[in-house]
Amino acid sequence: MNSKRIALGIIALATVVSLGTAANNAFARGHGNYHGQGQMMGQAYEALTPEKQAKFDSLIDAFNTKVTPLRDKLWAKHTELNALSSNPNTKPEDIRKLTDEITALRTQYRTEAANLDASMQKEVGIKTHFATMGHRGMGGMGGGCGMMGGKGGMGSGMMQMHDGEGPHRGQNM
């Protein structure tokens, strides 16, 4: 029975870790308060007209407004799962139920990200991969620089900027 609980706890924690990376402050601009997608997204963004950049920014802002409640719920479920996983009196069914709830929230998040990809293609004219970045393309929970000097994510990111300055307009925005 203890080995089952440990195994379920490990599975649950692995789920939460991959969840946390996907649910962190999201995406897009290589500058600013979001994770960049690396050098190519930063270059693609800078190549857009000011009007297209404004549309890109508004789509990202709308996306963040939609997914912030999902992120909050994911964080609450993650915290609860951590607490239950370390409690020897927790029933495996409780952990299973919680991981199912987390999976449902992740699915909702990915749906919103896929909608963002479609909107970016249609309205801005660039192909993005927010829905498929998953745990490999995003920074994890915590501080640090994003992929192009943006805020959020773990580590220094793919493109370390001088003195913490972002690559665009000489500053983090």
Curated annotation (Swiss-Prot):
Keyword Cell inner membrane set for record: no
Signal peptide positions on this chain: 1-28
Gene3D superfamilies: 1.20.120.1490
Keyword check for Zinc: yes
Keywords: Signal, Zinc
Pfam families, per database record: Metal_resist
InterPro entries per the UniProt record, alphabetical: Metal_resist
Sequence similarity: Belongs to the ZraP family.
Protein name as catalogued: Zinc resistance-associated protein homolog
